[in-house]
């Protein structure tokens, strides 16, 4: 279970992924698409469905991801947490949650694709960090929550192998930093021959 964090200011310092900005943008785009394709098929009677994050319904999960996307343009634009303030507090879904997601996701993706965006510094609550590190954390969140959402609505929960591989490569060396942070449930054991998606989910406290 992930902690209920809306503000990216609470992301964990120290992401050890060694891949470069081009790989980040590719992985981020794919993770965004994976989450989006599940959002687009949420039925009207599924908003209260539970998800693998036991404290979150489908609507709660989407609220979290919409909030994260709304923060991206101002943070990549150099704004501080205090400057953004309470702008994105409260309900960001309104009467049309899918449209709210589509708008926020498109604006976030455009911000990432701006020339030089991945080379910037973002101002988070724990201090300044690279946009690349922030981007990998957002990519991880999108990918893992795509699986959560798929489970919540009974959709296909398979993630692309290459996306699972790159996110697993980012998560594995960092998981010890997150122990006791409340960001994720403790890692789960998997068999030696488990596929990469199963390994990724298990590291983040999820059983496939």
Describe the residue ranges of each PLM region.
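Glycine-rich loop at the start of a catalytic domain that most often binds anionic cofactors/ligands
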Residues: 64-65
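Extended, alpha-helix-rich binding/interface surfaces that flank or overlap catalytic cores
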Residues: 61
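Structured surface interface patches that mediate subunit assembly and partner/cofactor docking
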Residues: 2-37, 41-54, 74-208
């Amino acid at each position: 279970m992930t902690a209920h964090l809306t503000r990216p200011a609470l992301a964990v310092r120290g992401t050890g992924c060694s891949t470069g900005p081009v790989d980040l943008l590719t992985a981020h785009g794919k993770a965004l698409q994976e989450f989006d394709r599940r959002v687009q098929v949420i039925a009207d009677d599924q908003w209260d469905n539970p998800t693998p994050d036991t404290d979150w319904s489908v609507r709660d999960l989407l609220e979290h991801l919409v909030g994260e996307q709304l923060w991206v343009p101002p943070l990549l634009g150099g704004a501080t947490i205090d400057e953004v303030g309470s702008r994105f507090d409260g309900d960001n879904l309104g009467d049309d949650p899918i449209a709210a997601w589509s708008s926020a996701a498109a604006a976030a993706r455009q911000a990432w694709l701006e020339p030089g965006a991945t080379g910037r510094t973002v101002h988070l609550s724990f201090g300044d960090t690279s946009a690349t590190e922030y981007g990998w954390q957002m990519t991880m969140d999108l990918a893992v929550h795509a699986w959560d959402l798929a489970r919540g609505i009974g959709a296909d929960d398979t993630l692309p192998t290459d996306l699972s591989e790159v996110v697993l490569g980012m998560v594995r060396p960092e998981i010890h930093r997150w122990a006791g942070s409340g960001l994720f449930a403790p890692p789960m054991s998997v068999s030696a021959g488990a596929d990469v998606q199963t390994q990724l989910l298990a590291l983040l406290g999820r059983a496939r």
